[in-house]
Amino acid sequence: MKISFAGLGKMGAPIAMNLAKGGDELTVFDINESNLAKFSGLKNVKTTGNTDDICEAGVIFLCLPNGDIVKKTALGPNGLISKMKKGAVLADLSTISWKAAMDVAEGCAETGIEFMDCPISGMEARAIAGTLTVMCGGKEETFRRIEPLLKMIGTNILYMGKNGAGQLTKLINQLLFDINAAAIAEVVPMAALMGLDPEKTASVMNSGTGRSYASEFFLPRALEGNFSEGYAMKNAYKDLVSAAEISASQSIPMPVLAAATATYQQALRSGYGELGKGAMIKVFEKLLGTEFRKG
């Protein structure tokens, strides 16, 4: 089978590497030459900076930064769906809004292309290990076609339903993570201000009922003053906006989402958009005049 992969960034590159191990003919695309260089000389792998070269594949994977880029790549003038073979599969691993996924699905349906929204959950280490969670939306028969490929990149592969179901599932999961991160940012500077030992407090939080993936990831890094790791705050904020759009359109009250969004907005206004979500802690540290760090 011919496979193509577009988008060789922090997540895309290790995912494509795992697909390359499967032995199928793989063509990888990126606009960045240095990203392509990682794949130069690999058996059964071709590299290209021209999207025309990836359109002969039966399955094309996308792993791109945002919905606007996905839509431009797939639907724009000279976009992929205008050049792909009828019946081929466009599988989008990117995290984009539910609305953007539905727009791409509609465009694909009009041109005879099978679309699957397949957002991934798990950070770079899991992408490298091939242990991602993949949530898939589209026709079940299309899912079955690409399921063997998805098993090369993840260990928890879930068919969630029709187009859009993958992105919606990812959003629900991501919201809980995002909200947890905002809650942590609010409480740990309070602990420091009130005289609690930060290391002991973090130990209690990560062994007690307050434990979460967010606390396990962000608290050790906060103690070291490391706020650069993890999903960029500006990208996480887009998840909150997507959820707010669904909340408004479906009349779903989400007061906790609204409160968390305000914390993200404060952090973005403070210039922390390129940092990880843990940098929200710095907002409240500055407000309270304290730091949650190792002694």
Regions from the language model: what does each represent?
Residues 129-137, 158, 162-194, 205-217, ...:
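Active-site-proximal catalytic alpha-helix in oxidoreductases
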Residues 269-295:
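NAD(P)-dependent dehydrogenase/reductase Rossmann-like domain
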Residues 163, 167, 211-276:
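Interdomain hinge/lid region at the active-site interface
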Residues 52-53, 59-62, 67-132:
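Rossmann-like NAD(P)(H) cofactor-binding subdomain of soluble oxidoreductases
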Residues 1-62, 88, 124:
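NAD(P)+-binding Rossmann beta1-loop-alpha1 motif at the extreme N-terminus of oxidoreductases
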Residues 31-32, 66, 139:
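Residues in the short beta-alpha loop(s) of Rossmann-like NAD(P)-binding domains
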Residues 96-174, 178:
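Rossmann-fold dinucleotide-binding core
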